[in-house]
């Protein structure tokens, strides 16, 4: 926490409160001074609004406590420009049962972080960056963390619903790795169960030798119709499911082919999204262990049997956790609980995170309670990271005209097409000589960045509208605006004739440079906040505000001097600031999975 500015400011505030109370002979009046904290100031870095409450809690005159508190804060070199502001507020209060208006006076303490402290911290950070060290120094013990995300179903194309899990999950992994943790990305694909008996039966009956992922989708739809309408096909499907579970060579061969075609399709999308190191460990991996788990829980009398089903119940949830159906088949519940046990006892994870939509909250609550009930949890942490739906631009569920879920590949292709049209128009306006391959490459990068940022920029628990025109806009809080901000930094630095000018101290020369550098130092706060909440949108807020501060910096701080398009001079200090900001922007780009573009 040593680089987290708000944490440091509040620590110093708490120390000042303790000393103030000691000096006013009010020792131990307040057990938890940490309940008092700064908030963001309107025209200053921070303000303390609870001096009246503090005075009332201690039965002291508020002016006396404010004066003493200011004295203590002034003795700390972390702060400067400390002052008090008295505010009058009209408030309705009850006196003898009657409402009456009264004027309440509040005293607010405002202050800034000192220029000396900012200068020291900025230059320490800049030297760390130039030496190749990490911009973030972890303060936590390294943990083994498993993040379960994406998890599409085999034999089906990835759809728009998989987008959020994949993008949010990957960003969380990158942030946790930056914090020094050992992160294992797990893709818990749906690759087992009755649906594969249906597929295998249909493929055998129709002697289908080859198929694409789209054709597999159609095979699944047709087999589902037959399963629901034909008793004979339903029985055949169940027999094929048993045959698959028993390791029949022909059944396994067909299953492996379906699996391979599906995974190849998934990897094409993962490659576009920049998703690497995602280990596929689906339901089939735990198949043998499911039987062992259910038998063990049965013999230990941990299971309730109702209508030949094996169930478990937890407090507060009436819906049963189904471990075995009446026909002996296993369920989604069974595979998830088996996977959890494997991750705890075999893979020995310290922290397991499930990035799955919010509709599954009850399921994970049940499973976590069962794990505690079975005494599986010691010091490990289990966490469900839920998220809202992807909606159309009109606020309705994103569907095709026929009412089907939109394929993720179609979404990506559509955004790439729009980005390509915009890119071609800009190239035409600027008379640039780009070939079709260059246009497609840059358009793909823009499209993927826009898809990711449009998702991550929204609080994950909220539904968000998928609006192509809005996400590709070059103005406002969009990926295109951010990419332009980074490209401008790179363009300025490319024109510097001698990179050695980037070495040296950074000097805070004016208000815009101070505001920009203060924002740079808040990167620790935003990373800590992201880890604490598992909400990557805080990184997006920080990034947008940082580039906004950089834009203001340019208005009063010239970096390069030109005479008739000839470079005649430069400001080394301003170039160092731009270089530092560029590196911070690049790191945040990396954490949210955006790809950098040299020229935009």
Curated annotation (Swiss-Prot):
Q: Do you know which SMART domains this protein is assigned to?
A: DALR_1
Q: Which Enzyme Commission number(s) are on file for it? A: 6.1.1.19
Q: Which NCBIfam families match?
A: argS
Instruction: Look at the named UniProt entry and state the broad enzyme category this protein falls under.
Output: ligase
Key words, A-Z: Aminoacyl-tRNA synthetase, ATP-binding, Ligase, Nucleotide-binding, Protein biosynthesis
Q: Where is this motif: 'HIGH' region?
A: 152-162
InterPro entries, per database record: aa-tRNA-synth_I_CS, Arg-tRNA-ligase, ArgRS_core, DALR_anticod-bd, Rossmann-like_a/b/a_fold, tRNAsynth_Ia_anticodon-bd
Catalyzed chemical reaction(s): tRNA(Arg) + L-arginine + ATP = L-arginyl-tRNA(Arg) + AMP + diphosphate
The protein's matches in Gene3D superfamilies, at most eight in alphabetical order, are given as: HUPs, Isoleucyl-tRNA Synthetase, Domain 1
Per the similarity annotation, which family is this? Belongs to the class-I aminoacyl-tRNA synthetase family.
Binding positions for L-arginine?
151-153, 162, 332, 336, 360
Q: Which organism is it from?
A: Acanthamoeba polyphaga mimivirus
Name the Pfam families on file.
DALR_1, tRNA-synt_1d
Which SUPFAM superfamilies does the UniProt entry name for this protein?
Anticodon-binding domain of a subclass of class I aminoacyl-tRNA synthetases, Nucleotidylyl transferase
- Give the molecular function GO annotations: arginine-tRNA ligase activity; ATP binding
- The molecule here is called Arginine--tRNA ligase
């Amino acid at each position: 926490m040593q680089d987290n500015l708000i944490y440091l400011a509040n620590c110093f505030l708490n120390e000042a409160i303790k000393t103030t109370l000691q000096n006013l002979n009010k020792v131990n009046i307040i057990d938890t001074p940490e309940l008092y904290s700064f908030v963001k100031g309107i025209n200053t870095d921070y303000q303390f609004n609870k001096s009246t409450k503090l005075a009332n809690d201690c039965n002291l005159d508020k002016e006396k406590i404010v004066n003493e508190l200011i004295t203590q804060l002034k003795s700390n070199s972390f702060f400067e420009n400390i002052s008090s502001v008295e505010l009058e507020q009209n408030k309705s209060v009850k006196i003898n049962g009657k409402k009456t208006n009264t004027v309440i006076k509040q005293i607010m303490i405002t202050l800034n972080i000192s220029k000396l402290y900012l200068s020291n911290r900025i230059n320490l950070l800049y030297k760390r960056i130039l030496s190749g060290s990490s911009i973030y120094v972890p303060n936590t013990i390294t943990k083994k963390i498993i993040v379960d995300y994406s998890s599409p179903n085999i034999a089906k194309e990835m759809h728009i619903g998989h987008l959020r899990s994949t993008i949010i999950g990957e960003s969380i992994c990158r942030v946790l790795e930056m914090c020094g943790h050992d992160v294992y990305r797990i893709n818990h694909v749906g690759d087992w169960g009755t649906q594969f008996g249906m597929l295998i039966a249909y493929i055998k009956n129709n002697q289908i030798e080859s198929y694409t992922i789209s054709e597999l989708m159609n095979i699944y739809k047709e087999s589902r119709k037959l399963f629901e309408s034909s008793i004979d096909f339903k029985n055949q499907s169940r027999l094929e499911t048993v045959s698959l579970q028993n390791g029949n060579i022909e059944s396994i061969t067909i299953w492996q082919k379906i699996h391979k075609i599906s995974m190849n399709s998934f990897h094409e999308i993962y490659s576009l999204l920049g998703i690497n190191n995602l280990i596929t460990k689906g339901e089939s991996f735990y198949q043998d262990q499911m039987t062992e788990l259910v038998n063990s829980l049965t013999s230990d009398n941990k299971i309730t049997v109702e209508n030949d089903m094996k169930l478990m119940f937890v407090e507060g949830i009436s819906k049963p956790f189904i471990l075995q159906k009446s026909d002996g088949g296993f369920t989604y519940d069974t595979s998830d609980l088996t996977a959890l046990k494997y991750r705890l006892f075999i893979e020995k994870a310290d922290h397991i995170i499930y990035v799955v939509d919010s509709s599954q909250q009850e399921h994970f609550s049940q499973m976590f309670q069962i794990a505690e009930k079975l005494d599986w949890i010691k010091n490990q942490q289990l966490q469900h990271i839920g998220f809202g739906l992807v909606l159309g631009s009109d606020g309705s569920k994103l569907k095709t005209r026929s009412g089907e879920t939109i394929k993720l590949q179609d979404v990506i292709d559509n955004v790439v097409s729009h980005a390509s049209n915009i890119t071609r128009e800009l190239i035409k306006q600027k008379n640039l000589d780009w070939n079709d391959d260059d246009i497609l490459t840059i358009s793909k990068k823009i499209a993927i960045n826009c898809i990711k940022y449009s998702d991550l920029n929204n609080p994950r628990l909220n539904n968000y509208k998928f609006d192509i025109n809005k996400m590709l806009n070059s103005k406002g809080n969009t990926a295109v605006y951010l990419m332009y901000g980074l490209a401008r930094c790179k363009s300025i630095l490319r024109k510097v004739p001698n990179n050695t000018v980037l070495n040296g101290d950074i000097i805070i020369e004016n208000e815009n440079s101070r505001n920009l550098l203060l924002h740079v130092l808040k990167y620790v706060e935003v990373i800590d906040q992201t880890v604490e909440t598992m909400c990557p949108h805080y990184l997006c807020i920080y990034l947008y505000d940082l580039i906004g501060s950089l834009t203001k910096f340019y208005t009063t701080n010239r970096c390069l001097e030109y005479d008739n398009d000839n470079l005649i001079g430069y400001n080394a200090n301003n170039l160092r600031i731009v270089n530092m900001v560029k590196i911070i922007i690049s790191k945040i780009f990396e954490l949210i999975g955006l790809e950098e573009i040299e020229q935009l």
